[in-house]
């Protein structure tokens, strides 16, 4: 029997579509309190969060993650019910299996085993858990971080249990993430009859040269840890649906994924310069979802990489690719932060799953990392 697999199945059984928790955190809290963790529940709005800590001394090691999952999609497209964990052909199926209930289970059993073997370990252990990561993420991890920051509590080492592995368990560790800056651009024209263009101003035509320049711009060159900043259009909307009407405005949604070689303000300024150069009448609204961050190789990456090599035999590659996570909030108070978890090939998909054979090794990697950083000599 596998204690980690059993707990993962219990977590998957709970229909915790964001922002609901549905009792996942209660399961974890019961196990953590039994090994000496002091738990603070921090509910905000419809979101359940908790901060659990064992010990008062430094250094502080934190596991961070989320109990919420994305919606299932069409139930009839699943081979088995998404909230009835099912093992088939060596795979554990269920919504959240990879993102990230296997990691949550592995956090708990890793702590249980580490504390049993090292009851007087150095420093402190903590878990920061939310049910608001897959949604709007305004009442979750960021609120807990605000509370910790307000009382001067900082984290030395943090592992966020996001599914980072690609081909085999342990092949990829995320030691940073790009920033995310989105924009909503509305270019104004004058609506009119398509047969009388001299009496109208077509905002699509007006925007096209600026759009071409934005798409061709090299924003920066990146650096040793990050690829160059990218700018991508996600949506363009204009027109009434009729073929004989020149639209009065055109709306464009776009996103920057940016390296630390650029700032949100520098990117905004360059966009304004391009739009103004083309003489557009426009409105532009911005949303900054996260700043870029990096954890250079150090004690945490060394301990985690050594644990991965010992348990799975993989050589971990440090990477900053991919989307944003709650690491963007935690890094404010964390000296060293990485993301590491199971294979991510099926996350957010129908028939989400993890390799059963990876579940206990994942817990072992987390435990070995703890030993590398907090076990007394």
From Swiss-Prot:
Coiled coil: none annotated. Its EC number is 3.5.1.18. It comes from Chromobacterium violaceum (strain ATCC 12472 / DSM 30191 / JCM 1249 / CCUG 213 / NBRC 12614 / NCIMB 9131 / NCTC 9757 / MK). It is an enzyme of class 3 (hydrolase). This is Succinyl-diaminopimelate desuccinylase. Binds 2 Zn(2+) or Co(2+) ions per subunit. CDD domains: M20_DapE_proteobac (cd03891). One of its GO terms (molecular function) is cobalt ion binding. Pathway: Amino-acid biosynthesis; L-lysine biosynthesis via DAP pathway; LL-2,6-diaminopimelate from (S)-tetrahydrodipicolinate (succinylase route): step 3/3. Zn(2+) 1 binds at residues 66, 99, 162. InterPro entries: Bact_exopeptidase_dim_dom, DapE_proteobac, Peptidase_M20, Peptidase_M20_dimer, Peptidase_M20A. Zn(2+) 2 binds at residues 99, 134, 348. Its cofactor is Zn(2+); Co(2+). PROSITE patterns: ARGE_DAPE_CPG2_2. Homodimer. SUPFAM superfamilies: Bacterial exopeptidase dimerisation domain (SSF55031), Zn-dependent exopeptidases (SSF53187). One of its GO terms (biological process) is diaminopimelate biosynthetic process. It catalyses: N-succinyl-(2S,6S)-2,6-diaminopimelate + H2O = (2S,6S)-2,6-diaminopimelate + succinate. The active site is at residues 68, 133. Catalyzes the hydrolysis of N-succinyl-L,L-diaminopimelic acid (SDAP), forming succinate and LL-2,6-diaminopimelate (DAP), an intermediate involved in the bacterial biosynthesis of lysine and meso-diaminopimelic acid, an essential component of bacterial cell walls. It comes from the Bacteria. Keywords: Amino-acid biosynthesis, Cobalt, Diaminopimelate biosynthesis, Hydrolase, Lysine biosynthesis, Metal-binding, Zinc. Belongs to the peptidase M20A family. DapE subfamily.
């Amino acid at each position: 029997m596998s204690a980690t697999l059993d707990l993962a199945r219990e977590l998957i059984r709970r229909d915790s579509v964001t922002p609901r928790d549905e009792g996942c955190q209660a399961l974890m809290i019961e196990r953590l309190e039994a090994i000496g963790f002091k738990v603070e529940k921090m509910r905000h709005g419809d979101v359940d969060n908790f901060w659990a800590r064992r010990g008062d001394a430094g250094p502080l090691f934190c596991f961070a993650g989320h109990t919420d999952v994305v919606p299932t999609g069409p139930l009839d497209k699943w081979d088995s019910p998404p909230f009835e964990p099912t093992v088939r052909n060596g795979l554990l199926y269920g919504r959240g299996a990879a993102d990230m209930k296997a990691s949550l289970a592995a956090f708990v059993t890793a702590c249980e085993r580490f504390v049993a073997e090292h009851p007087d370990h150095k420093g402190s252990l903590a878990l920061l858990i939310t049910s608001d990561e897959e949604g709007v993420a305004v009442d979750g991890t960021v609120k807990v971080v605000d509370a910790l920051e307000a009382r001067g509590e900082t984290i030395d080492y943090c592992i966020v249990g996001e599914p980072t592995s690609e081909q085999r368990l342990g092949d990829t560790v995320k030691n940073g993430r790009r920033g995310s800056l989105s924009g909503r651009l509305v270019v104004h024209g004058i609506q009119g009859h398509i047969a009388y263009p001299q009496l109208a101003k077509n905002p699509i035509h007006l925007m096209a040269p600026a759009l071409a320049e934005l798409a061709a711009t090299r924003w920066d060159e990146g650096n040793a840890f990050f690829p160059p900043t990218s700018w991508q259009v996600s949506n363009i909307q204009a027109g009434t649906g009729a073929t004989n009407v020149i639209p009065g405005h055109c709306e464009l949604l776009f996103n920057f994924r940016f390296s630390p070689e650029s700032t949100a303000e520098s990117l905004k300024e360059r966009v304004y310069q391009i739009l103004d150069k083309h003489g557009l009448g426009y409105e532009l609204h911005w949303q900054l979802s996260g700043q870029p961050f990096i954890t250079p190789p150090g004690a945490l990456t060394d301990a985690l990489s050594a644990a991965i090599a010992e348990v799975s035999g993989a050589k971990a590659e440090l990477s900053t690719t991919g989307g944003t996570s709650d690491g963007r909030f935690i890094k404010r108070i964390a000296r060293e932060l990485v993301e590491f978890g199971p294979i991510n090939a099926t996350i957010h998909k129908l028939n989400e799953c993890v390799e059963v054979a990876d579940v206990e090794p994942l817990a072992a990697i987390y435990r070995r990392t703890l030993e590398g950083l907090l076990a007394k000599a």
